[in-house]
Amino acid sequence: MGRAFEFRKARKFKRWGNMARVFTKLGKEITIAAKQGGPEPENNPRLRVLMQNAKKENMPKENVERAIKRAVSKDFTDYKEMNYEGYGPFGIAIFVETATDNTTRTVANVRSYFNKNGGSLGTSGSLEFLFDHKCVFHIAKKEDLSLEDLELELIDFGVDEVEEDEDEVVLYGEFAQNSAIQKYLEENGFEILSSEFVRIPNDLKEVTPEQRESIEKIIEKLEEDEDVQNVFHNMKEDDSEEE
């Protein structure tokens, strides 16, 4: 489950081509977290971990501070988080997460991307069952850390997969248990390198190279939109590229 998702994420960042898009996405997340939980990271767990995300992506400190200040500004128009679900070409399910200050603009744009690229926008909640909503934590390795012991300890907190990479450990857990998992990690001295929410497809659909090209067009159009934060789908990745 996890490694395939990490590969998809790496491809998405490669498509974006520069860090400006990553910074825009992170900035919105930071602003939303500061608006909901306050601007002080010591009192706001979600903001705290997003600041670690920003550090990992080399986001300038002034960008982070600006995103936090935006949340407490009296002139700030609040972002509304909206999800859109639909089918792309060849029956590929596509789940779109947005953060916008103008929902009318956003839904019109998202619908046009589907319609102009052989897809159709569905009703809210219609495709949610096709994806598992997960939280993901990347933590620094500890000396003499037993992954088996850690996994057993975290089962009670909703963690269902633990993976080891060269420099870090990656935990996948239930979305609803995000706060509990973060609290456990912080209280037990684990360094959280980054954290995110993902939607992992329950089943992947095989496509031909020609079909893949059509599907990737709609995914790219969606990801290029400034209001779109994340795009998830159930198309199986090209095994030759993953290798």
Curated annotation (Swiss-Prot):
One of its GO terms (biological process) is regulation of DNA-templated transcription. Disulfide bonds: none annotated. It holds the Pfam family Transcrip_reg. GO terms for molecular function: DNA binding. Gene3D superfamilies: 1.10.10.200, 3.30.70.980. One of its GO terms (cellular component) is cytosol. Keywords: Cytoplasm, DNA-binding, Transcription, Transcription regulation. It is found in: Cytoplasm. PANTHER family: TRANSCRIPTIONAL REGULATORY PROTEIN YEBC-RELATED, TRANSLATIONAL ACTIVATOR OF CYTOCHROME C OXIDASE 1. Belongs to the TACO1 family. This is Probable transcriptional regulatory protein BDI_1233.
